[in-house]
């Protein structure tokens, strides 16, 4: 599992791939995709608490949030950030711009207003990214845990995480059924390793407020209109 190629990074300048690091800062930014899950998400919350009351950003699917509103509430009560991962986990590559942006808005309505969006599978077209960037911060990553890959073990995931992590990294885990066997091993071991290596774990930093004049409202803004 490798970092995302730099050629992809340059496609859309407004997309966040990694948090710039300066001086002696050693922050790492943990993110969790595809939840909430009725067993795994509470377990992740507990792991983060046990390892130092750490904070993370959870990119939640609207359909899942509708099934488990109490978990969304618990995430926020614990000080974690809840962010948008679309309503139905659609790939931008195989979804029309209109449908993709509608999915974003439906998830936004389900979760309440959020300040970030992560495209499912990391698949988003430049037009979709530019349109959404007028409304929200589109966030990708530079380190994948690989916990979704059934051909890998939890140990494989941990080795990749240890090899690729650097100051400012945005790291992706998944609080999903598919990822569970690898997540359950890799996450606690990774948190121990981060502490040993002197890293500080954070939720993603606050984004600069977007001007009201550039916010997208369902395709009516000329700045946000796509294809």
What is the predicted role of each segment?
Residues 41-42, 68-69, 97, 151-154, ...:
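Conserved strand-to-helix beginnings and helix N-cap segments that scaffold or border functional pockets
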